[in-house]
Curated annotation (Swiss-Prot):
SUPFAM superfamilies (alphabetical): Ribosomal protein L25-like
GO molecular function per UniProt: 5S rRNA binding; structural constituent of ribosome
Ranges of Basic and acidic residues composition bias in the record: 205-215
Subunit: Part of the 50S ribosomal subunit; part of the 5S rRNA/L5/L18/L25 subcomplex. Contacts the 5S rRNA. Binds to the 5S rRNA independently of L5 and L18.
Organism taxonomic ancestry: Bacteria, Thermotogati, Thermotogota, Thermotogae, Thermotogales
Gene label: rplY
Function of the molecule: This is one of the proteins that binds to the 5S RNA in the ribosome where it forms part of the central protuberance.
Domain of life: Bacteria
Any GO BP: translation
Residue numbers spanned by region Disordered: 192-215
Family: Belongs to the bacterial ribosomal protein bL25 family. CTC subfamily.
Protein name listed in UniProt: Large ribosomal subunit protein bL25
Length: 215
């Protein structure tokens, strides 16, 4: 579990949010089914150290302190939403979700692709349609990642949502027929195969005509 420190944000509003960002802090809010929204602020320098290591499925121990440095609350939360500046792409606001025991939650879990498909060895290329899988689960059963082995995939093969192996109690929210990963056939290979099929289909007709002429 990742640990992150936040400070209570006493003053709210857009003007205050801009002031915080200029000071190197990121405004955020904590909420949940049984949690009243708590406005907080986090040092950008602290956030940047862990941001590349967490996903929406990573449980975070959020230590909330007041301006004097006294701990007022410790909560297990998940990163629910990240707002970024449209131009600079820097993080401007965060939403943290505190689940309640017995209350199922919807969350996106990273997809981990392992292995090299046999179809890639034949000139195909692997297409990943979903880098994250939306699931419904109990808070204490959130998987850190969903692994899918693509080693046996040949040209044109597809792994659908129904093929994913999920832990007990975790439900995939994609349609069963939804494609997750596939080995796509390169255009030139597809044209070659189509030409060969046409030639094979035409061959018996040519032979038949020859036989008729000989008669």
């Amino acid at each position: 579990m990742v640990s992150l420190e936040a400070r209570v944000r006493e003053v709210k509003g857009k003007r205050e949010a801009r002031r915080l960002r200029r000071r190197g802090e990121v405004p955020a809010v904590v909420y949940g089914p049984a949690t009243e929204p708590i406005p907080v602020k986090i040092k950008r320098s602290v956030l940047e150290k862990i941001f590349h290591t967490i996903s929406e499925a990573t449980p975070i121990q959020l230590i909330i302190k007041d301006d004097q440095g006294n701990t007022v609350a410790e909560k297990t939360v998940f990163l629910k939403m990240v707002q970024r500046d449209k131009v600079s792409e820097t993080v401007v606001h965060l939403d943290f979700y505190e689940p309640t025991k017995g209350h199922r939650m919807r969350i996106n879990v990273p997809l981990k692709v392992v292995g090299k498909p046999v179809g890639v060895e034949k000139g195909g290329f692997l297409e990943v349609f979903h880098e994250e899988i939306p699931v419904e689960t109990d808070p204490d059963k959130v998987p850190q990642e969903i692994e899918v082995d693509v080693s046996s995939l040949d040209l044109g093969d597809v792994i659908h949502a129904r093929d994913l192996k999920l832990p007990e109690g975790v439900k995939c929210l994609l349609e069963e027929e939804e494609a997750v990963v596939s080995v796509l056939v390169p255009k030139e290979v597809a044209i070659e195969e189509a030409t060969e099929e046409e030639e094979e289909a035409a061959e018996p007709e040519v032979i038949k005509r020859k036989e008729e002429e000989e008669e």
